[in-house]
């Protein structure tokens, strides 16, 4: 019978194309399922799977992180950070990224992508800002909606996350985000609403944090009242991994507990059903949502077509996003683009020059199938027209250089290059080994795959042995980056010890060696769970004083300093400082004092404290994290092949004290939190006292000059705005206004301009001085002019009424403001909404 039912399911898959057919199949399955089978569906399995119902032929369905590409199943296209996508202000590129990720999911048999990530950028220090789309709900919502449509075009489920107000990583499981009702509706929920109602997202992931004292996964107001009833969401709600803390989630509206059912299991639910504390209809609704979504996207069909992925085309999408997302923040005296003969010799230096990070850390990190760092990309693009020199200002060389310089042999006679590698199916390096081979280098990102044939994909260990002979006497640096544990021995002496479970971490050790002596080398490594990776290398320690290295900069026409954060500093599970490390700020200051043509390349997921050096350098590019595009688009912009068109999706304060979250996030910009929780026994909260005055709304309301305003970004050309037209100029509350304006490229280069439409409501209800309501990006040749059209619907004019808990359009005057940024308004005109 089981086989017959399974064959029936397979037969039905191709014809379940209408909502009515899908509901009929869901009802048929519900009628056949036992309560135990229904409950089994409510918890995940194997880390990233929805369970199946084998008796009915319903298969498991696979999920994967994350927003910047597919984290599972080896290498995939690694797209630029979400914040870089938002900085493009390009809805089409958001769709193209989603479409590419959806295609790759199909190729890898993944049914759910845990993306997009779309929490509001509240403070620069949030470790996951790099994944998100900035500080404004309109920009966030439109970017997310187009991303979702791209993903789901491929019959892959997009999962919008993290619902809601997950705006800090510090103690994210227990610190309550305490948000007033108007701010919650107008700022923090608004983007999700757009992604669901306009984008059609079929899955929502509840956040780790409590909202107003109640964990999001157990918050009935959030999941049932707002999401499912008021918004009409018919998809499924899953928890973030380990985000459920009690059986309250059952009646709150959570449908799927991930990665497994700790609370939504039969041991808990069946007694609650018998006691009348949970209704059968509640369980049926959860199962119905899971089955409906999977059937809608054809995820139960074993014969789903796997498209042939055009990896080069997807790389081009990633490259285009990076090109349009990089923001030119400063370009004094038009130093950029670099051109001969004014600039012929260029020095590149800084911690991120060679060790260029592709992404922040955590579940959003993707293993790219190609990558080029800043130094190599700039050097390649410069060709023979420029002389480019890398100057290492770090104590230790980059990992890329260390690996290239390392020379190891598998025999003491130094005849056979490489390491002898032995693999074990345990984490203790205990015999017997299950595989052996010779590796030319130790530079592996195994991910979730097995490191060798016959070896497990988790809970394994590797021992590499080799021999080497130093080329000179002196101190050498030994470096290892690993996930999880690593130990390095030289002639039996333990010189580097990082033997524990951890995310990717870099460790360095120094040891004096003698020229001409043959040394024995041993590297032990284990991976207990999750993705495995290890890189190792060694080289002579360059002890040339930094002052000597920097003095040479006076001989170069320009100096490019690569500073910022990386996956270890900025990522999931922790927050990062507002300021760059002291040594990086000092490096920029020293370089700019020696070379007047100093250019800063900043790698970060948001704003920083620019004050230590912004007035001393000539040019600044905010590159965010560029994924596998790496240094290529940066080089293209530096030399003028690409005209920068990115604009900031967040505001940057001149100092942390000016920020809207100051006083209820971190004190004085230091790394230490102002709150401490003892978890569930003494939960604490962060009060969002700025309410609706987030980001640029705060700076406008309090008349504070930011370092760089929301929507700001320079170009190598200039744009002129004109002829603002509103039609009609008077409407009723349910009316619509059409807005038109002209934009002309009055410069000498082709370029693109992100045109921003803001509204100021001159009503009795207090509103911010301006709020973004729409945007568009226009591409113009020199001298070319185009007309842009926007539509202001009632939804874009609504304000949330906290007295009657409803959305309303208020009567009064409304001012339309068309700008190049939130502080560069070019055109204004009013219209009237009558009572």
Language-model region placement:
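Flexible, membrane-facing loop/turn or short amphipathic-helix motifs
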Residues: 802-803
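Glycoside hydrolase catalytic-domain context in secreted enzymes
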Residues: 18-476, 481-484, 489-493, 501-799, ...
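Short beta-strand elements
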Residues: 824-835
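Bacterial Sec-dependent N-terminal signal peptides
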Residues: 1-21
